[in-house]
């Protein structure tokens, strides 16, 4: 069956109304949970093969997050799927107004390779809860994980309802040539532009979860020991292959040396004296990215790190960096942290705001005025004060970007809303019919109209 037939089969199935019943949605979420738990061993093995992820990191950053999202959404789907009563203006008396949630239809979820299980499955949870049919396209760069997900889904779901299309660029293009009712894409800006262009032909709404160069600021009031540990965690988790990882560092000149020493100490504590020999240290996804990252390091001064072998690059801190340095011209997506110092916060803000809006921003400070200044003057998707990356691991806030770092947000209720169209409905009583809206227009009715509409 070719891709056009796969997508049409889903449109035909959605048209039957089979996905509208909330009981059926809940049953589908339950089947997904059971399948993930059944396949957890194979998922672990696949992520070990693709990225050298340990079972601990796989559960913390992939499987556990999906199961948590399933639990949260499963408990609330029935309530979210009900009509929502809203007030009605006096001018429309006697009426009842409500918003009726309906699924978009057939949605395409395109996932990346860096967290290949979590970033594929979390959007799917929201799409299923909202009553959609789903076509999932995982990344060809993580083939073992893609294969396990395809097997899991094929064994668990009717392919008319939820199916996986494996493959590379040819399959991506073939999918984007089809008419979907919603497209959810996670990846880079280059492909995102292709997705938007293809979606525009059908006026298909999209969510774009992208990336960018996310700054981290450490000011002179920060708790340096805490900042260093949390910065090292957020930057070097998954070998820096995290879309919201700190991409570059601004540290106040007065605490620069202390922070550097603490960062190096924490890297040793996390990964040992030789991180490249650490069994739990994640590898770079492929040789193309391995060579690209080494090219960004070449010619720069490494305070620590810089070693590379067998597809791994050690956690690396660079100094002597300026805004014109090659490494500051693109998202790094690797375990390399360029560092710049500052004395004037206004200069840092001017630097960040002169560049495309980042997916995340991280600020380490104990000064409330500094916190408010940065949050109010810098636009970014989301972030943390006195921590890194953990803002994405909550169902109570949307995760997403702004500007070049993306559009739309998801997690928890925001995932349900992303894949839901809310129909605005007004139901009018028959026993009362105010006359002023009808022709012929009279002076008396005009006065009444002005009483209601002002």
Label for each model-derived stretch:
Residues 14, 18, 33-36, 40, ...:
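Structural signal for hydrophobic packing residues in well-ordered secondary-structure cores
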Residues 25, 70, 131, 162, ...:
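Residue-level signal for inorganic ion chemistry
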Residues 3, 22, 40, 224, ...:
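Residues at or immediately preceding the N-termini of alpha-helices
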Residues 217, 268, 309-454:
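Conserved C-terminal structural/oligomerization subdomain of aldehyde/semialdehyde dehydrogenase
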Residues 190-322, 345-346, 385, 453:
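ALDH superfamily catalytic-core signature
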């Amino acid at each position: 069956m070719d891709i056009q037939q796969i997508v049409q089969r889903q449109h035909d199935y959605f048209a039957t109304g089979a996905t509208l019943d909330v009981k059926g949605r809940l049953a589908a979420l339950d089947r997904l949970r059971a399948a993930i738990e059944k396949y957890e061993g194979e998922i672990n093995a696949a992520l070990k093969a693709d990225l050298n992820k340990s079972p601990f990191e796989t559960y913390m950053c992939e499987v556990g997050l999906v199961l948590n999202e399933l639990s949260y959404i499963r408990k609330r789907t029935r309530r979210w799927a009900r009509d929502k009563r809203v007030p009605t203006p006096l001018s429309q008396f006697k009426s009842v107004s409500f918003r009726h949630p309906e699924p978009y239809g057939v949605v395409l979820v395109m996932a990346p390779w860096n967290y290949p299980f979590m970033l594929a499955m979390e959007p799917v949870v929201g799409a299923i809860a909202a009553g959609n049919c789903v076509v999932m396209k995982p990344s060809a760069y993580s083939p073992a994980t893609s294969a396990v997900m395809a097997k899991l889904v094929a064994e668990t779901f009717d392919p008319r309802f939820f199916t996986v299309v494996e493959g590379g660029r040819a399959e991506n293009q073939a999918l984007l040539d089809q008419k979907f009712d919603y497209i959810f894409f996670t990846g880079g800006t280059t492909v995102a532009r292709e997705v938007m262009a293809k979606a525009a032909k059908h006026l298909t709404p999209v969510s774009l979860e992208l990336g960018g160069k996310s700054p981290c600021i450490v000011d002179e009031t920060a708790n340096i020991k805490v900042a260093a540990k949390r910065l090292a965690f957020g930057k070097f988790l998954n070998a820096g292959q995290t879309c919201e990882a700190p991409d570059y560092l601004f540290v106040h000149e007065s605490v620069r040396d202390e922070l550097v020493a603490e960062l190096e100490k924490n890297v040793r504590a996390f990964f040992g004296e030789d991180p490249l020999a650490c069994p739990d240290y994640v590898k770079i996804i492929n040789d193309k990215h391995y060579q690209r990252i080494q090219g960004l390091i070449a010619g720069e001064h490494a305070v620590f790190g810089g070693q590379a072998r067998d597809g791994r690059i050690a956690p690396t801190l660079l100094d002597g960096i300026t805004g014109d340095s090659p490494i500051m011209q693109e998202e790094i997506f690797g375990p390399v942290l360029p560092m710049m110092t500052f004395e004037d916060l206004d200069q840092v803000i001017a630097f960040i705001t002169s560049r495309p809006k980042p997916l995340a921003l991280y600020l380490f400070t104990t000064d409330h005025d500094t916190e408010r200044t940065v949050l109010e003057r810098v636009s970014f998707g989301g972030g943390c004060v006195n921590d890194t990356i953990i803002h994405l691991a909550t169902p109570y806030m949307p995760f997403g970007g702004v500007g070049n770092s993306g559009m739309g947000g998801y997690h928890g209720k925001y995932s349900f809303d992303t894949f839901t169209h809310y129909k605005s409905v007004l139901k009018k009583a028959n026993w009362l019919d105010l006359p002023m809206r009808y022709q012929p227009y009279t002076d008396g009715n005009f006065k009444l109209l002005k009483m209601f509409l002002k």
